[in-house]
Amino acid sequence: MKQKLTLRRVLVSTVAALAAAAAVWLLCRWVGYDLQLRIGNEPVYEIANDDYTRIIDVPEDGLWQTVPLEAGQTLYGCRLRFSTHGELYRAGMVMVDLCDADGTILREAAGNYANIFDDNFTGFAFGTAYTAAQAETLCLHIYNVVEWEGPLGLWASTGTVGAMSLTADGVDADATLALQYMTDDSGSWPSDLANGLAPLLAFAAFAAVLLFGLRAPLPLTVAVVGLACGLLFVRVTPALVAPDEYTHLAAAYELASRLGGETPADENGCLLVRESDAPHFGTRSGEIGILAYKAEALARQKEAGGPDALTAVSEAKAGQGSGNYLPQAVGIRLARNAGANFYTMLRQARTFNLIFYLLLAVLAVALAPAALRGLLACIALLPMPLQLAGSLSPDASVLGMVFCYTALCLRLRTKKAVWWEKILLIALGGAVGPAKAIYLPVVLLCFIIPVDNLVGPTEFVRGSFGVRVRSGQLIREAVLVLAGGLWLSANLGELAYAARDMNQMLLAVGAVGIVLLLALVRWLYGKVQNDAKKLRLLKGALACAVALAVVGGVLALSRMGGGLAPDQLLMTNPNGDSIWTFSLGYICRNLPATAKLLLRTIPAQGALWLQGILGTTLGEPIVYRIDVSWLLGVGLVLALLAAALPVQDEQSKPLLGRRTGFGVLGIILCVAASSLVVALNWTPINYETLFGMQGRYWLPVLPLVLLLVKGSRSVCARRDLSRGAALAVTACTLLTLLQGYSLYASWQPVS
């Protein structure tokens, strides 16, 4: 029952929203403060001279150490190795000035004797960094400015190292100080970046609580809250750190070049890029850490863009693009037309991808039956979909399309389709087919729609071979044919590669035979469906045929290919991985070994798969393991289960019947099996667990899993909890963003 909007509800909701925004703002400030204490003002040093064998005391006039700098080289300070001759001094001050060739002081740094220890390096940070405009030689002037208790020495080499001469009292000391350049410094960036996230985080919390309190339409909630959280992921995820983002960048960039009528690759298949973009194209994930955040922020502000002229050859290969990259490519195209620099272009491409995902997600929530809108809203606002949407990943658009198709099929299960819904069903089914190979089984959801709901003004039409069929059945067949045809055109090469060690002609004949048998079974079912005795005979015969086909198929496939000689089994790459992977032939010929690998994988990677579905593991988990608190994962699981609970007094019959539920379960299992087979194709045969399998691959069928939970009615809620669950999911997503930023910023490479 729709509740009336009262002034009291508006005031209470506004106050609660302001309180939530204030709490999130304070929490964000705390994260910045904590990070500043832990990783703020942390320098990075580069060795300039590590050869030191003697001690030179600092004379009254000080020491003058020449420092050659290259054009563009930045110096934040330096670090020197002191000697106190075994003493512990309590008084004295050492100055380190950076001077030009004329002795003009460019930068200054000071150090207290109390912080200088015998035979230890001591850092001196300048007030501001110095960047050489051109190649030049500067000097470090090291001297005392107040009385000190005793002699203070500096370790130096015997003999001058390179062009780094040392002068003491105007005389060449024939030495070079033990010296390290301070090449970078985290400064106040940890707190500054956190403070920059605070307004958007506070707005997301404010909007979520306000819309919940006002009981706003769920599509509006997904649009507003999803946009705020997605833009936060755009900012929090470091450049090229999202899953496979460097590959997606190359594909989207290539498509953007084609949209502009440009030649995207050279004769060797390497991607052509703008001169200003070339340094950022590679074949590995980007860097993380506070210094990576800092470098990205400074580059976005200061780095020059350039004209849209593809004059540089990158390391990335062309030929990875598809229609799934269209939103990202449009963002890149517009940024290049405007002459934007690389990081501005990257952020714009991410934003376009986010907007396209949100359009599809909002459409899915709007299309879904009223009882399922809250459930779909919860899934759409999970951290993982928003993280993918806030990157260059084409999986975001695939997610949106599958969500829309699922919602439309469930919608048409309970109502008669109008003309635009029929067109949308065919279009979405055709789009889901080639979107990603493993999601083809989802197209079968069109069979949960009763034929009567798809029948048009003319109930019967002429089909293939002049057969008289119902128009609704023709629509379902059109969806299957379109999706299957586009799937084959998009994935035939990958399918041939997976079956590379099998007789592909026999496989093709077998596939055609299976299709013809299915068509025969469908025709026979139409003939006997109204005769109970004949229908039982058909089902019995079909069960026997399936059992014989499975046994015979396994025996046939296990002898068709996949055999490797002993010397072939020993062939490995330099890193120790076998050069052979689990092809279809190898899988069929080695079913016990495949089963053992899968059984070992489940306990080893099961928790990571769940994290991948929810989004509590960030970035590319194969490269960086950025895992937020398991408490957030528990909160997200509980929120999803709450959204899936049926309402106790709900009088309407379940959305899925028993037989339909088994069919949906079969679709889920087919998608899971397909993803495992694909991951096996990436896995070397000497691995003990799967390689490359990630939980996010199962995210498109998560609505179906929760739909089965909702239909069980084993546990019921007194009232609909989906709106509160969506608010809880939003809260967990915001906390994931905050902790994710903290983990990204504080990450340190393993030494």
Residue ranges: model-predicted function:
Residues 187-191, 460-543, 552-647:
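Membrane-lumen/periplasm interface segments of multi-pass, membrane-embedded glycan/lipid transferases
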Residues 259-348:
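Interfacial juxtamembrane loops and adjacent helix segments
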